[in-house]
Amino acid sequence: MAPSLWKGLVGIGLFALAHAALSAAQHRSYMRLTEKEDESLPIDIVLQTLLAFAVTCYGIVHIAGEFKDMDATSELKNKTFDTLRNHPSFYVFNHRGRVLFRPSDTANSSNQDALSSNTSLKLRKLESLRR
């Protein structure tokens, strides 16, 4: 069936639910006026509420489309073993291992380079503040 039919069915169901809520509110206010607050809702309002709820749920289920299988084997058929436990979003390339595990002669020279670049940067900042 056409998707617009199911959307119309959901609309009708929601309208009927709103009407049932309005009817229940009117019945409650009528019961307060007549001082008969211990009576329950009439059966027609209860049936309208249940039927409208069922129609709305039926329409929503058809709008949602096909459900997926709960069994994971259908999803796992398309994946290889290598990609099964592969989570590239957890890869971190900017970590301290690069500094900890490099040879000591390059570490000393890079520290000196970093110190000289830091001092030149500080000097540039001081010059910009003096102006």
Curated annotation (Swiss-Prot):
GO terms for biological process: magnesium ion transport; protein insertion into ER membrane by stop-transfer membrane-anchor sequence; tail-anchored membrane protein insertion into ER membrane. It is a multi-pass membrane protein. The chain crosses the membrane at residues 4-22, 44-63. Component of the ER membrane protein complex (EMC). GO terms for cellular component: early endosome; early endosome membrane; EMC complex; endoplasmic reticulum membrane; Golgi apparatus; Golgi membrane; membrane; plasma membrane. This is ER membrane protein complex subunit 5. Keywords: Endoplasmic reticulum, Endosome, Golgi apparatus, Magnesium, Membrane, Phosphoprotein, Transmembrane, Transmembrane helix, Transport. Coiled coil: none annotated. Residues 1-3, 64-131 are cytoplasmic. It comes from Pongo abelii. It is found in: Endoplasmic reticulum membrane; Golgi apparatus membrane; Early endosome membrane. Its main location: endoplasmic reticulum. It holds the Pfam family MMgT.
